[in-house]
């Protein structure tokens, strides 16, 4: 499974939001997309998903333009969690999550979808709320319920096979979570990659980005400013230029060589 952007651009309101972006997301890897507010991170992710039509260039899924793919194939190849995921008040959590597999796996029986939905709700820490209406949940619980729904979209497509799941595209998946739940969500992200699925996520906390990502893409003024492993990309020079951090806030672990930011709760928006 492969997902790649080729000279992709997007304009809105007479302003170019994403400039000529090219990048290949890798199966089995987590890619963190970081950058200051207004850099184009969410737009880039929406372009990769096909939720926004590209204003220039092309997006490929398995070397085929996504505009040429059937809805079922596209749904099974990538799934996106947006920051404004819709609420579906008339559904229980189990039914909401099960709906994630309707387009990507139309031949999967209803009972199998419901069983898989229950498993996913347990994974995101909502196993006790299977029959609950989503409107009765906190913001963090709703966010994890919708994470289970987009995971369902990919896992239903490969259910009962030895195939790897597709690409999870996650826009700020831990923004509404407390510290322990942030760790849970990012553990799920890593587990998805270990199964051979790809992950691209927009994240503001640089320390979490380094902790969970194999690759980092830095957006600045709508352009891909840097890309590569965290230890190569996240330097004091970059942090100062892109995020306005003070020189010396980026440190490196002696044992791993991975960078980290002090103070540890540094959020770069």
Predicted regions and their residues:
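Conserved ABC ATPase "signature" region
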Residues: 111-129
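The feature captures the beta-strand-to-loop junction immediately N-terminal to the Walker
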Residues: 34-36
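Conserved ABC transporter NBD signature motif
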Residues: 57-65
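ABC ATPase nucleotide-binding domains
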Residues: 236, 240-269
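Helix-to-loop junction immediately C-terminal to a conserved catalytic motif
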Residues: 49
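Conserved structural motif at the start of ABC-family nucleotide-binding domains
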Residues: 3, 18-20
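ABC ATPase NBD coupling module
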Residues: 65-79, 89, 107-114
